[in-house]
């Protein structure tokens, strides 16, 4: 944890997406336009799309026509039903995440590769509330997205099964009862074998989500990669376990060692000294935005991967939307200028997910009442969709069987009693 961090790393193995590659192309004297000596990302994307199936799309069309009735006689496109029952039109339909099937019977969640879980809890906030509406806001704007990503060559509809199990029933103004609900819900989804994606909610949910994971790890360990501007390591805030406190309590559990907690993007004027003291004493691994910029994105990703996976069996990602510069994500409880650019955060996420055994992710601190034109909710949607794409590209999804780190029997005593 106390390993010095080089400020000038050697040329990374993975070239930065923002670094010019002059050796890979030359200019023609006639047009002065670059001619690439290797396929461009766009060229590769065109070929990847050719290789994707259309099976899922056709199934959606057939089901839409069966359940939603064939369109009126005047409709020339005969894939359009009378009642909207699929992706289109984007402005219509019931707002599950990306219009995924709603699974009312959560006992069947294990039949899917990925489960979206809403956690509408903001009783842990210490300033601006509203994150209880985060799941609604994210789901609503997610209808803007298609299941296909051009650059990645991934079509989620064709390559994985996605469901939305709705929201955990949280208790307003009672963190501890809400935490119990969250831990039970997360443990259920995790143990089923479905990959859990949580829509927060304030960051106080970080503790109960990790507790839910740890209940089904047996003697295995989980590393935590935490994107944030704030350390969130106080024992209490305002006399309770608030959104400034999740990692103090999560790393009290033997399954989630503090030395495997990596905190990316920390900095600014909202980092309480009590939390800094805990980071120092427990040896967490912090990189500021300046560290990341001076090291380079690849060196920062290498650092995060090495620390989070050292002696652990899987990695939990906790993505606080305020790690991104406040100009891009105004709809959050504690906006802090000077954060990561969206493309920087997304690149780090890409490297981390493609190179670690990820067991789940939460996206927290989206507060729609403070948002502008759904910017923040859309950023959260992008993080979630990119996560699923990288899991597909890296071969982690779809799962042929449950990962070996999932322990069938629950251990309800993973955390220390706290009053």
Features from the language model and the residues they span:
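Conserved alpha-helical scaffold segments that buttress catalytic/binding sites
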Residues: 31-419
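Low-complexity proline/serine/threonine-rich segments in eukaryotic and viral proteins
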Residues: 1-29
């Amino acid at each position: 944890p106390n390993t010095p961090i080089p400020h000038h790393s050697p040329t990374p193995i993975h070239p930065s997406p923002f670094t010019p590659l002059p050796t890979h192309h030359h200019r023609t004297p006639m047009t002065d336009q670059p001619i690439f000596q290797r396929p461009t990302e766009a060229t590769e994307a065109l070929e990847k799309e050719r290789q994707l199936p259309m099976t899922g799309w056709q199934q959606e069309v057939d089901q839409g026509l069966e359940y939603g009735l064939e369109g009126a006689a005047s409709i020339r496109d005969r894939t359009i039903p009378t009642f909207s029952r699929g992706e289109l039109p984007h402005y219509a339909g019931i707002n599950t995440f990306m219009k995924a099937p709603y699974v009312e019977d959560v006992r069947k969640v294990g039949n899917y590769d990925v489960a979206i879980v809403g956690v509408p809890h903001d009783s842990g906030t210490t300033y601006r509330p509203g994150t209880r509406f985060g799941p609604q806001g994210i789901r609503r704007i997610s209808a803007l997205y298609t299941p296909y990503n051009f650059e990645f060559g991934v079509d989620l509809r064709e390559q994985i099964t996605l469901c939305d199990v709705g929201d955990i029933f949280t208790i307003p103004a009672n963190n501890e009862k809400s935490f119990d609900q969250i831990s039970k819900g997360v443990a259920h989804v995790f143990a089923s074998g479905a990959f859990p994606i949580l829509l927060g909610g304030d960051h106080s949910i970080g503790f109960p989500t990790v507790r839910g994971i740890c209940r089904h790890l047996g003697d295995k360990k989980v590393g935590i990669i935490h994107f944030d501007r704030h350390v969130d390591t106080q024992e209490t805030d305002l006399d309770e376990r608030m959104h400034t406190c999740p990692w103090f309590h999560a790393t009290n559990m033997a399954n989630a060692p503090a030395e495997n907690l990596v905190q990316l993007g920390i900095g600014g004027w909202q980092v309480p000294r009590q939390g800094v003291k805990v980071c120092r004493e427990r040896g967490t691994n912090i990189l500021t935005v300046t560290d990341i910029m001076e090291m380079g994105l690849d060196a920062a990703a290498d650092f995060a991967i090495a620390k989070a996976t050292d002696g652990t069996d899987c990695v939990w990602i906790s993505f606080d939307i305020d790690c991104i510069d406040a100009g891009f994500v105004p709809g959050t409880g504690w906006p802090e200028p000077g954060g990561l650019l969206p493309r920087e955060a997304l690149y780090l996420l890409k490297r981390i997910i493609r190179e670690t055994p990820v067991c789940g992710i939460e996206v927290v601190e989206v507060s729609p009442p403070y948002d502008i034109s759904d910017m923040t909710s859309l950023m959260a949607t992008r993080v979630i969709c990119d996560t699923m794409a990288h899991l597909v590209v890296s071969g982690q999804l779809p799962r042929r069987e449950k990962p070996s780190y999932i322990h069938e029997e629950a251990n309800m005593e993973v955390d220390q009693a706290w009053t």
